[in-house]
Amino acid sequence: MATLEQKLTVLISDTIESMGYELVGVECQHAGRFLTVRLYIDKEGGVTIDDCSDVSRQVSAIFDVEDPISDKYNLEVSSPGLDRPLFTLAHYARFVGREMVIHLRIPMFDRRKWQGKLTKVDGDLISLEIENNGEHQFIFSNIQKANLIPVFDF
């Protein structure tokens, strides 16, 4: 059975792509009585507030017609930011060599949170080089959340 995030991705991805943006990912989180639906979009050269506003209007229109969410919800549209979330295997492959943090669904060695350098993607296995702990492999389906760690060069 598809998750709400997957259903929404299928529903809106073509529209967002036709507008010239990449739909990086969809997150749904309950906060009190409301559901927050967060869309991450990107494009060459970066995303502006006007881009987010344009996408929000289009997606709101789709949601009004299709009514895919039964709860009250807030829609947020933003750029992926410096701590970019990774949603697909293609995202991981694109950022090999970067530092990241992952949160696992099922703990590995009694840990859910891991931080390290992404060294490779092989099929559905993600490899991280963990400082002072060597390389570890993680099954993509066990990764609940992953974000790049921003690098600031001064």
From Swiss-Prot:
Query: What Pfam families does its record include?
Result: DUF150_C, RimP_N
Q: Which InterPro entries match?
A: Ribosome_maturation_RimP, RimP_C, RimP_C_sf, RimP_N, RimP_N_sf
Q: Name one GO cellular component term.
A: cytosol
Record keywords, A-Z: Cytoplasm, Ribosome biogenesis
- One BP term from GO: translation
Its subcellular locations are: Cytoplasm
Question: Looking at the record's lineage, which domain of life comes first?
Answer: Bacteria
Q: Which family does it belong to?
A: Belongs to the RimP family.
What does this gene product do? Required for maturation of 30S ribosomal subunits.
What PANTHER family does this protein map onto? RIBOSOME MATURATION FACTOR RIMP
NCBIfam families referenced in this protein's UniProt entry, alphabetically = PRK00092.1-1 (NF000927)
Q: What is this protein called?
A: Ribosome maturation factor RimP
Taxonomic classification: Bacteria, Pseudomonadati, Pseudomonadota, Gammaproteobacteria, Pasteurellales
